[in-house]
A protein has these predicted regions:
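A conserved non-catalytic segment of reverse transcriptases
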Residues: 33, 114-188, 192
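Conserved polymerase palm-domain catalytic core
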Residues: 1-128, 133
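A general alpha-helix detector
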Residues: 10-14, 85, 169-173, 192-195
């Protein structure tokens, strides 16, 4: 829904802060206004650029928060965004309690004037120290203890839905394999695994 909610007037104001040439702005207006007064078509070459322009100030805000909360090389609050998918991580140290709630509040304050709302089904706070996972860009991420028990690392695994889809493709490749040489079947399976 994010791409459908981008307000053209807000997007044009943000672009006009950087582009002074009236001819270029006229061309940009034609591109943006082609579909009405709200939304940009997903999948086109302009939509990723529009998404980044629309959230540029949000990116700068969370970069400032990241720098402000840094302790040496350790960052207490981190922000990662790809188009309309984003994740904010907060260190689990007991002195940082409440930071996640404040980060979520700041996020909501920043996106409300843009006409963007959080997807409440996908918005959640998790404690990775307790083994909880969170999803981002088709992957589940969870904190896992290193072998030998010395420290942790973040394990990324494809979401269950994606794994099932790949398994179904592999079953189909094998079922249709018939007299196909094994090397060719392996190549097809590898292509399915690579996506």
């Amino acid at each position: 829904r994010y791409f459908d909610t981008i307000r053209h007037s807000v997007l044009l104001d943000k672009i006009a802060k950087r582009i002074q040439d009236p001819q270029v702005m006229g061309l940009v207006k034609q591109i943006i206004k082609a579909g009405g007064s709200i939304g940009v078509p997903q999948g086109g070459p302009f939509s990723p650029l529009a998404a980044n322009i629309y959230f540029n100030e949000l990116d700068w805000l969370f970069d400032a928060i990241r720098r402000k909360t840094a302790e040496g090389e350790y960052e207490a609050v981190n922000y990662h965004r790809f188009a309309d998918d984003l994740v904010i991580t907060v260190s689990g140290h007991h002195t940082k309690r409440g930071w996640a709630e404040r980060a979520l509040q700041r996020l909501q304050e920043q996106i409300a004037p843009l006409g963007v709302e959080l997807n409440l089904e996908k918005t959640k706070m998790v404690n990775t120290l307790n083994g909880e996972a969170f999803g981002f860009l088709g992957f589940d991420l969870r904190r896992v203890r290193k072998r030998g028990g010395d420290g942790n690392f973040i394990l990324m695994t494809p979401k269950k839905k994606a794994r099932k889809a790949v398994q179904a493709k592999i079953r189909d490749i094998i079922a249709r394999g018939g007299a196909t040489p094994a090397a060719e079947v392996v190549n097809r399976i590898n292509a399915a695994l690579a996506g």
